[in-house]
Amino acid sequence: GLAAALAAEGAVVVGGNLAAVRGDEWWSLTLLGSVARGRAWTRAGARPGDLLAVTGWPGRAAAGLALSRLESPEAFRAASDEAWKPLLEAWLRPRARVGFALALAPAGAVTAAIDVSDGFAGDLARLCEASGVGCDVHARSLPVDPPLERATGALGLSFTTLRFGPSDDYELLLAIDPGRRDACERAARESGTPLVFAGRFTDRRGELSLVTADGATRPLEPRGFDHFAGER
């Protein structure tokens, strides 16, 4: 398809918002920038032993979207409650972690990076695939999120589904050199960015595992938003 058409002209896809949509109207926005040679953060480069750093509150946007789709009057009133405001804000007004990224970039601590635009597990899987590594995610190290926990009952969705499934949060998943962890924590403090170290990259290529609070390990399914579901 697209790759073959570009190949005929000696061109390649370097990124962008590729999707299949139905309907007469759609919007797309592309931003271009520049970075010094060798300083760009890419998905490739994570190494076994690197730390997994996570900004903010992954899963909130998914909960906000689900709340916005509730149809009954009782459910609508619940979604309008102040308790749900952080979830609706995450979906309606996401904020990229630009200040944190600018504060962290000079430290040279990041070996690979991706933003959570399709879902925590799905985007982490893409980073691992590009880097040729796996990752163990520790549930106990992820941020406690009372609004997200409360939403599970109202929505009938599990916390795991909201936290790791499809969600356009625009938080960052970073592979961090263990020797430069302090620099990452300092950048988070300086920029006022919530940050946790939630796991470690492994040599088990493509394998994502969730280490539960009781120490058990189970596969973490790489679920994320499917941009081409509309054509199937």
Which residues fall in each region the model found?
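Glycine-centered structural positions embedded in regular secondary structure
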Residues: 1, 33-35, 64-65, 69, ...
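Short alpha-helix capping/helix-loop boundary micro-motifs
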Residues: 36-40
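Glycine-/charge-enriched secondary-structure boundary and capping motifs
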Residues: 1-14, 18-27, 31-32, 106, ...
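Glycine/charged-rich beta-loop-alpha catalytic/anionic-binding loops adjacent to active sites
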Residues: 34-35, 81-87, 155-156
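Short, acidic (Asp/Glu-rich) active-site segment that either coordinates a divalent metal cofactor
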Residues: 26, 41-103
